[in-house]
Swiss-Prot record:
PROSITE patterns: BIOTINYL_LIPOYL, LIPOYL
Modified residues (N6-lipoyllysine): 65
Protein's UniProt keywords contain Acetylation: no
Organism: Pelodictyon phaeoclathratiforme (strain DSM 5477 / BU-1)
Name this polypeptide is given: Glycine cleavage system H protein
Cofactors demanded by this protein: (R)-lipoate
PANTHER family: GLYCINE CLEAVAGE SYSTEM H PROTEIN, GLYCINE CLEAVAGE SYSTEM H PROTEIN-RELATED
Signal sequence extent: none
Subunit structure: The glycine cleavage system is composed of four proteins: P, T, L and H.
HAMAP family named in the record: GcvH
Its biological purpose: The glycine cleavage system catalyzes the degradation of glycine. The H protein shuttles the methylamine group of glycine from the P protein to the T protein.
Highest taxon listed in the record's lineage: Bacteria
Gene name tied to this protein: gcvH
Amino acid sequence: MTIPEDLRYTKDHEWIKLLEDGSTALVGITDFAQHELGDIVFVELKSAGTVLKQHEVFGTVEAVKTVADLFAPVAGELLELNALLDSAEIVNQDPYNDGWLVKMKVASPEAVHALLDAEAYRQLTGE
């Protein structure tokens, strides 16, 4: 399993990456999560403009085996949904790059830094 060092992680297996402006971030699911889910066939997300609290559900991932909720890693506003998700298998193929789910304006960049780093996530998953 791949666990990039430059991301932060949640116990629910989402990742978040602050972009260069320091207040916008990309969010996706981890390689561990996509592997556990199996073949992803559909992703449903709340609309751009939706304001979320930390841990609030912002969508679902439907796989052949199951359906899983997606939880906001931090509070913020959804700015953009990944257009490539029309082909949901991109999440399996490239979860950390082309398979990102949403771009969001984070309410507090400090909240991102408080999430799990790569080593803590590695310990959580046993990888």
